[in-house]
């Protein structure tokens, strides 16, 4: 949503250069920051989540599973009602055109998609979130609010965190992995023990505010 407000306010230089002025969407032209009076983010990964580093194999599998599903459904008639927007990887058909059933199980395209940085999963990493934060500025006419969640309890001896009783059971392994993951830096990004508290998917500290913005 912060990117949405950024586009309304400042537009997109890439879209302006690549699109004729008469065909440019108002979303990318800028000058509409006053359309949004306030923005409330709930458990938003402002600075990314360490789950990708605590459970690398699990998250890699999740990426492959997501793009594989998009490759299958994106080449069926269902793509007309929900566009997976994976055409750049040749994984989905163009909506309102004949589905490319023969393009299902495009393993080469799936691998390229997973290894690229042009997808949501990359934006959720610490490095992807940092890249986004460098592009996004706060609009002076918009009030920003953040609501962060925590469903872990700290062990007084180790300082690590594990799931609390009220957490959804399927999130217990994720919460424990994030809460007990030992690290100091992740490729020059400083991480402290304050990152152990989480809600099962997102580090609580990351849901408070973007690192490069005041709180």
Feature locations, PLM:
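Helical cap/lid subdomain of alpha/beta-hydrolase-fold lipid enzymes
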Residues: 28-215
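Conserved beta-strand->loop/alpha-helix structural units within folded catalytic cores of enzymes
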Residues: 1-4, 41-43
């Amino acid at each position: 949503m912060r990117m949405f407000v950024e586009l309304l306010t400042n537009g997109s230089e890439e879209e302006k250069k690549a699109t004729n002025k008469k065909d440019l969407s108002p979303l990318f032209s800028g000058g509409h920051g006053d359309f949004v009076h306030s923005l409330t983010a709930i458990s938003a990964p402002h600075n990314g989540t360490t789950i990708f580093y605590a459970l690398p194999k699990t998250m890699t599998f999740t990426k492959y599973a997501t793009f594989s599903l998009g490759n299958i459904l994106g080449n069926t008639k269902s793509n007309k009602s929900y566009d997976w927007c994976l055409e750049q990887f040749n994984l989905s058909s163009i909506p309102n055109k004949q589905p490319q059933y023969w393009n299902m199980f495009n393993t080469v395209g799936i691998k390229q998609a997973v290894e690229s940085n042009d997808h949501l999963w990359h934006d959720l990493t610490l490095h992807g979130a940092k890249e986004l934060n460098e592009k996004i500025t706060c609009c002076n006419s918009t009030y920003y609010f953040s609501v962060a969640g925590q469903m872990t309890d700290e062990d007084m001896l180790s300082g690590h965190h594990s799931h609390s009783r009220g957490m959804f059971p399927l999130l217990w392994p994720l919460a424990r992995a994030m809460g007990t993951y030992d690290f100091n830096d992740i490729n020059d990004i400083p991480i402290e023990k304050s990152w152990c508290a989480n809600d099962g998917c997102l580090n609580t500290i990351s849901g408070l505010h973007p690192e490069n913005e005041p709180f």
